[in-house]
Amino acid sequence: MLTNEQIQSCLKREQKALKHCYESCAPYLYAIIRSYIYDEENRKDVLQEVFAAIFSSLSSFDINKGPFKPWIARVTVNQCITYLRNQRKLNLFVPLDIESYTGIESEDKILNQFSRQDMLKYLQRMPEGYRTVFVMSVIDEYSHKEIAKTLEISVGTSRSQLSRAMSWIKKHLTVELNITKNG
């Protein structure tokens, strides 16, 4: 990632340092964006917004409080959520009685059945609302309370969306694995 000296150079708005920051961090941040945003062109737009946010708020980054990588990851996730909110795509969240999902297997049991590559492949096909909560919960390890606050939904809706996402994954990956085995 970046050294403390390079971060200090970015704070001074040195063009060479800003360019290096972009070139070294863009692939990592783009991978995060891919988890949230389906459309390629929109991903590129969000990546630009992420760097604008990083560069404009770089002065708030405190080297003594923690590493740079998690800080820029958090900025990226926040920008993705802001983008989705602005696109009104988060209206896909439908409140659901969580009790109706008590028969679903645990997250770990479902996730351990499939490779990471399979998961990433199907993540892009998952409905937006499910995918957002799934990524925040499983990949970014947000609590349901944090997800609810960030997305402005209830904790129950967060749980139900994750349950629906897990069911969706299980259904689609199981079908794919059966086709692969029998095909």
Residue ranges of model-derived segments:
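Internal acidic/polar
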Residues: 82, 90-116
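Arg/Lys-rich amphipathic alpha helix in sigma70-family domain 2
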Residues: 60, 74-94
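Amphipathic, Lys/Arg- and hydrophobic-enriched alpha-helical face
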Residues: 22-41, 57, 73, 123, ...
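N-terminal module of bacterial RNA polymerase sigma factors
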Residues: 1-27, 171, 183
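A short pre-motif secondary-structure segment
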Residues: 133-137
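Short, charged helix-capping/linker segments at alpha-helix termini
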Residues: 11-20, 30-49, 155, 178-179
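Sigma70-family region 2
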Residues: 11-12, 51-65, 87
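C-terminal edge and immediately downstream basic/flexible tail or linker adjoining helix-turn-helix-like DNA-binding
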Residues: 6-9, 91, 149-152, 166-183
